Design a protein with these regions (language model features):
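Extracellular glycan-modifying ectodomains
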Residues: 1-183
Length: 183
C-alpha cells in the first residue's frame, strides 16, 4: 500500500487499485485501529491528508507515527552495527555478553539519523493536529534520550532491526508491545 497513490498528481488507476486493496483486506476490514507508519518521502506527506480523508468513511481510530528512525549501516545496506558486532564475535569465537548489548545500544543511538527528518516529522505532527488524530514519535519508543541508547535487541535477545530501518518479526512484536504499554 502506498500513501503516494493519494497524491493529487497520482494516476487515477493507482488510487482505485489502492482503494480496492483496502476494501478487500480482511485485516483492514476487521480492525478498529489503523496505524500509519511509513518512511514518508515528501510526496507521501503531501498525499497524507487525502489518504486520511479517504479513511474517515471507515470510522476507525487512526494513529499516525513519525517517520521511521533509520540507522547508518556499514559495508552494505543490509548490515547493521549489531550484525557487524555479532559477526566479529563469531569470527573470534567470542560469546555475546551483556556489555556487548549495552555497547551496541549506545552505538545505535549515535548512528540514528533523526535530524534529517525533523522537517517531515513537523509536517506529520501538524497534519495529525489538523485532522485530530493521535501522533506518536517513534523516537519515544525506539530510544531512551536520557540514557542515550536505542534498543537493539528484544527482551528475549532477538535482533530488532533487519537493516537500516526495517524491523525483524520479533523486533516488530517487541516494539508493538512497548508502544502499547506506553499509551
Amino acid at each position: 500500500l502506498t500513501i503516494g497513490s493519494f497524491h493529487p498528481e497520482a494516476r487515477e488507476e493507482d488510487k482505485k487499485s489502492v482503494k480496492k486493496l483496502l476494501s478487500l483486506n480482511k485485516n483492514f476490514i476487521e480492525s478498529e485501529v489503523i496505524m500509519i507508519a511509513d518512511r514518508f518521502l515528501q510526496n507521501e506527506v503531501e498525499a497524507l491528508p487525502n489518504f486520511l480523508n479517504y479513511l474517515e468513511q471507515f470510522k476507525k481510530q487512526v494513529i499516525l507515527l513519525s517517520k521511521s528512525n533509520e540507522y547508518e549501516t556499514l559495508e552494505a545496506p543490509l548490515r547493521t552495527q549489531v550484525d557487524l558486532k555479532l559477526l566479529e564475535l563469531f569470527k573470534n569465537k567470542g560469546k555475546f555478553k551483556l556489555e556487548h548489548k549495552e555497547e551496541l545500544e549506545k552505538i545505535m543511538y549515535k548512528k540514528r539519523m533523526v535530524d534529517e527528518y525533523t522537517d517531515i516529522n513537523i509536517q506529520l505532527s501538524n497534519i495529525a493536529k489538523k485532522k485530530k488524530i493521535k501522533y506518536l514519535k517513534k523516537q519515544d519508543f525506539l530510544c531512551d534520550e536520557e540514557n542515550k541508547i536505542c534498543d537493539a535487541f528484544t527482551t528475549d535477545g532477538y535482533k530488532i532491526y533487519y537493516d537500516y530501518g526495517h524491523y525483524t518479526l520479533k523486533g516488530a512484536k517487541y516494539l508493538g508491545e512497548k508502544m502499547y504499554n506506553m499509551k
